[in-house]
Amino acid sequence: DILVNTNRILKQRIEPRRFMTCVLLRWNNADKKMYYTGGGHEHILVYHARERTCEAKQTGGIALGMVPDITKLVKEEQIGFEPGDFVVLYSDGSTEAKNMQGEMFGLTRLKSSVEQHALGGSPESVFTSVSKDFTQFVGEQVQEDDITLIVTQRPQ
């Protein structure tokens, strides 16, 4: 309902051909599970501490503001989110950022960076280390898009 109502209001208030992507995460303390609903946003990265792997989950859905009603396009999915696991959210400016040679940072590099730094780390240390990898990759190249990175962890 949140994305459906947000889309309805946004569609009425923004200029044609404008839109917004998003992903909505919801933690259910009763069943100890994380749920997400996509609004055409980037993948969600989930680092599974037990397996020491990082998984990219497509968020699905459609960007908000593109069509008047997204009721039939909104679907809530579940994320496996065990104690010690991380969820990483990011904007497309993070993966599409280019270095001086024009090469994009990309999803594969972002996943690898999370995998490398998550083991035994905290959300703060993972954020700092991934940000450092990103900064070293892009160097002095000016970026034209926003670069957003959010890291959260389910406590042990």
Regions found by a protein language model. Give the residues of each.
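Conserved subregion of the PPM/PP2C metallophosphatase catalytic domain
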Residues: 1-156
